[in-house]
Curated annotation (Swiss-Prot):
Family listed: Belongs to the small Tim family.
Gene: TIM13
The keyword Mitochondrion appears for this protein: yes
Designated name of the protein: Mitochondrial import inner membrane translocase subunit TIM13
Domain remark text: The twin CX3C motif contains 4 conserved Cys residues that form 2 disulfide bonds in the mitochondrial intermembrane space. However, during the transit of TIM13 from cytoplasm into mitochondrion, the Cys residues probably coordinate zinc, thereby preventing folding and allowing its transfer across mitochondrial outer membrane.
One of the GO biological process terms: protein transport
Classification lineage: Eukaryota, Fungi, Dikarya, Ascomycota, Saccharomycotina
Length: 101
């Protein structure tokens, strides 16, 4: 193993080749941030569904009617989440087209 590889002589610490252009690095960073935001959004969705639907609908002792409540709450929450996400994505895309981002 060469010392240059230990000290990052042939590659950067992020694992990208040293010959990467700044635009390649920028694209990779944008992609990574986008993926991390998607994971954070999915986590937030699961947390909110649990908080809002399960706590609202599930009571002890269990009753079959609770399944219907959870199903309806989840469907309503997902419709709302999708509508908000679409509006947000459209707004971001429009800002990108206009050069605001």
């Amino acid at each position: 193993m060469a010392l240059t590889s230990i000290f990052g002589g042939s590659s950067s610490s992020s694992g990208t080749p040293a010959t990467s252009s700044p635009s390649d690095v920028k694209t990779q960073l944008k992609s990574q941030i986008s993926q991390e935001l998607a994971i954070a959004n999915a986590t937030e969705l699961v947390n909110k569904v649990t908080e809002n639907c399960f706590e609202k609908c599930l009571n002890a002792p269990y009753a079959a009617s609770q399944d219907n409540c959870v199903d309806q709450c989840l469907a309503k929450y997902m419709r709302s989440w999708n509508a908000i996400s679409k509006a947000y994505i459209n707004r971001i895309q429009q800002a990108s087209v206009n050069g605001e981002i």
